[in-house]
Amino acid sequence: TTSWSLPLSPFMGLHRAPRASCVLRANNDYEAVQAWLSLHEAPATQRAYRKEAERLILWAIVERGVALSSLATEDAVAYRAFLRQPSPRQRWVGPAAPRTSAEWRPFAGGLSTRSRAYALSVLSSMFRWLIEQRYVLANPFAGIKVRGARQATLDTTRSFSEGEWKLVRTVAEGLEWSYGWQ
C-alpha cells in the first residue's frame, strides 16, 4: 500500500516570488492552491480543479522530490507524459475507493487525450493566477500542448461584417478628433 499522508513543507520553492511582493497570505504551496480553489464557487468546478492540482502536487513531491513552486518546464513536460500512463502503476492507479482508504489512488488509468489537455489547461491557468498574485515567477505549463487535442475553433458567425467594421472605425475616428486622442 501507499501512504499519501505527506508532510506539507513550508520551505521556499525555487520559483517562488519574493515574499514581500506576494499578495497572498499563503505560507506554502498547499495554502496558495487552496486560495486559488476558493475563487471557484461551483462545487463541481472546485472538485475538478482540486483533483488536478492535488495530482500534480503529489507527483511533484513523490516522483520529482520538489515542491509545486519548484517545478520547471522540463517537469511539466514529464508530467504530460506521466498523465498518458501513470507509473509505477501500483502507486498511482487503482479502482475507485474513498480518499481515506489505503487503497485510494489518484488515477483509475491513463488519461485520454482530451482529459490530458484539460488537466494541463487547468494547471496552466492555476500557475497564471499564482503569477498574478506574485506567488511564483513562472508558469512551467505555459505553451505545453497535448498532441492530437482539438484546438478551439474561431466562431466566425459572431463577427462584424465589413460594413459594421467601417462604422466602428468611423465612430472611433470621430472620438479621436472630438477628444483630441492621438
What does each model-identified segment do?
Residues 1-182:
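Conserved catalytic core of the tyrosine transesterase superfamily
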